[in-house]
């Protein structure tokens, strides 16, 4: 394993000074690059968990892979939600026995035709749950019917339908299984650091500090649970936009009547992997020092009053409550509805003799 990095700290003299007023800037930046270059095969196997998704455990894989960093995230690639079910996919017309573009009622299915043909701007891979080759062409079975997409693991052979999640079939065999798992990013940030400014006017001071993190990924397990529609847990308002009928284009899969069937729409994928970039306004502190000449007569050298507001704001595109999460050992960073940092107010007095 190899670690490379650097850290830079900057603190300026007053960048400007006008009478009693002055300002000082400070900043620190750091980068740490981690990679696994080689590892004993037995040790590597002992650290990696096998793919064992039985339709109910919503398993998060813990893996170390040569060439990637510790804290890597592994799962399936989310391609969207199937717009049409298999029987409504517009490929087969039972009246003619040909692969024409008609729906079950015999009406020309122009939407399915467009999706199947791969018109510009349309994702053909989530049109209907049928297998496609590397060129995006439909794969047919020996009877001339489109090969259906299935989740195939152990004794499970679940056939995906309209409204189910479309996962990337890497090897184009029509089966979603452990062979389709891929590297989805690292929980380690590419950069992190902080900066602030200290303003002084006479005996008054105003200090600020910001910290940031860039380039890390988080598994939003809280969102996974609140959008899974698989048990009696409270659900997010996002499920109101779930798939309900053929032809509906949405990013939220359908609701299913059984927990196991619903779980295949909640496999760990980059649907739930989010950027953890953030900028936090860490604190704002106002301070005032009493006149040292007057304090000396009373036997004091220093008396200083401070008042601070901590954790004022966080700017982030992360959809969870707080993007500031840490990883442990080689595990990926997971947000399982962790209580976010609270905003606090503090006051203090520093007395010197």
Regions found by a protein language model. Name each.
Residues 1-3, 51-89, 93-96, 242-248, ...:
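C-terminal beta-signal and terminal closure region of outer-membrane beta-barrel proteins
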Residues 3-7, 22, 190-194, 278-285, ...:
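Transmembrane beta-barrel architecture of outer-membrane proteins
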Residues 6, 17-18, 203-208, 293-294:
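Repeated loop/turn-to-beta-strand initiation elements of outer-membrane beta-barrel proteins
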Residues 100, 108, 122-126, 132-140, ...:
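Extracytoplasmic gating/loop element in the C-terminal half of outer-membrane beta-barrel translocons
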């Amino acid at each position: 394993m190899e670690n490379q990095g650097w850290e830079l700290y900057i603190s300026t003299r007053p960048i400007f000074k006008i009478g009693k007023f002055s300002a000082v800037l400070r900043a620190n930046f750091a980068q740490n690059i981690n990679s696994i270059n080689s590892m004993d095969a037995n040790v590597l196997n002992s650290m990696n968990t096998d793919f064992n998704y039985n339709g109910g455990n919503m398993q998060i894989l813990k893996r170390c892979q040569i060439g990637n960093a510790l804290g890597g995230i592994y799962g399936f690639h989310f391609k969207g939600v199937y717009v049409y079910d298999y029987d409504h996919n517009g490929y087969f017309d039972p009246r003619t026995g040909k692969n024409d573009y008609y729906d079950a009622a015999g009406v020309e299915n122009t939407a399915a035709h467009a999706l199947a043909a791969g018109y510009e701007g349309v994702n053909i891979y989530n049109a209907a749950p049928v297998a496609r080759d590397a060129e995006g062409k439909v794969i047919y079975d020996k009877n001339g019917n489109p090969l259906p997409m299935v989740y195939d693991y152990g004794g499970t052979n679940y056939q995906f339908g309209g409204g189910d999640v479309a996962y990337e079939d890497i090897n184009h065999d029509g089966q979603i299984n452990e062979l389709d798992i891929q590297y989805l990013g690292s929980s380690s940030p590419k950069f992190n650091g902080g900066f602030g400014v200290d303003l002084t006017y006479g005996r008054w001071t105003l200090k600020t500090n910001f910290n940031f993190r860039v380039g890390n990924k988080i598994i939003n397990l809280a969102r996974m649970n609140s959008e899974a529609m698989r048990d009696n847990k409270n659900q997010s308002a996002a499920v109101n936009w779930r798939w309900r009928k053929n032809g509906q284009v949405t990013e939220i899969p359908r609701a299913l009547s059984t927990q196991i069937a619903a779980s295949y729409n909640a496999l760990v994928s980059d649907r739930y992997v989010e950027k953890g970039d953030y900028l936090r306004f860490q604190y704002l502190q106002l301070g005032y020092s009493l006149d040292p000449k007057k304090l000396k007569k009373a036997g004091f050298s220093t008396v200083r009053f401070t008042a601070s507001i901590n954790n004022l704001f966080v700017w982030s595109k992360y959809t969870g409550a707080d993007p500031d999460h840490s990883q442990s050992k080689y595990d990926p960073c997971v947000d399982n509805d962790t209580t976010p940092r609270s905003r606090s107010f503090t006051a203090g007095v520093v007395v010197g003799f």
